[in-house]
């Protein structure tokens, strides 16, 4: 394949760039790019553009995405995911009804503050670099759209959601903000991307 699109089911433990480099080497490709990063702890659909296919990045990066997310309630972490240090812990429990009520605050267009550990840039430098140096920077809230939030399973402290959202949405931030809305903290425990635009994980290799 000299040009086109390749759909990968990214495994846990690899960065998006590591997967890209492995594919590039295995298929002896010169030009490869990915259309939407997945954190190393996350798995699921990763779209790669090959050759002239890399020019389609603007189209794919603007597409809606769907995920299955597992949120751990009762503990907040500095990275907003399972890999960070605990910053807040609560012994309080919440009911299914509490969760459903809180989730209503995350439907439709919302203002979302990006995680301080993210690849967003500040003066040309990724936010995660500032955070690791002990100088976290909080970016202004951005408008994102949550098209659907569906509870798959709830067994405290774990909540499994299916989320369909617009570009630029941080699922880690939803976990963080839901935990805060419930007053007990929360962080993202696992994440799997199911869809991006018209492409589905079932079409991947």
Language-model segments: residues:
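Catalytic/RNA-binding core of pseudouridine synthases
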Residues: 1-205
